[in-house]
């Protein structure tokens, strides 16, 4: 997901992207947490970044959370290098703010779905939100 917006709108849009990403993982019924990334861990373009980490029971010795999506507010950092500008109401030329969000890091999200929905017999229950797309509700070993 990408957003180009006015500087005064970027915080609000950042929260909106995070809300969309959170809704996706709530819909999948996965345990997750939101991490507000520490400033020292941000890449150069990002002013602020949120990660959503889903619980992955198979990670480590006792399971761990792993990043499945993120959203970054890059303010005008990317706009400056790309020279993306707008003219404000007073006629002044300013740089837009740019934001991005992964939505779903598919390979990592699939790990979380498989590990959280695996049954004792090895079958995997399909999350209810995906059944209408898959056409089935369980993955089972063929006899």
Predicted regions and their residues:
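TRNA-recognition modules of translation machinery and tRNA-sensing kinases, especially anticodon-binding
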Residues: 2-143
């Amino acid at each position: 997901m990408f957003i180009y917006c006015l500087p005064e709108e970027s915080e609000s849009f950042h929260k909106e992207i995070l809300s969309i990403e959170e809704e996706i993982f709530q819909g999948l019924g996965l345990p997750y947490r939101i991490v507000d990334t520490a400033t020292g861990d941000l890449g150069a373009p990002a002013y602020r970044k949120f990660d959503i980490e889903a619980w992955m029971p198979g990670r480590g010795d006792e399971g761990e959370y792993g990043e499945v999506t993120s959203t970054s507010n890059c303010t005008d950092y990317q706009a400056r290098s790309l020279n993306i500008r707008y003219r404000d109401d007073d006629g002044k030329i300013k740089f837009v703010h740019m934001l991005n969000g992964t939505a779903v890091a598919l390979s990592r999200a699939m790990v979380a779905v498989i590990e959280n929905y695996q049954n004792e017999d090895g079958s995997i229950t399909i999350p209810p939100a995906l059944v209408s797309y898959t056409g089935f509700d369980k993955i089972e070993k063929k006899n």
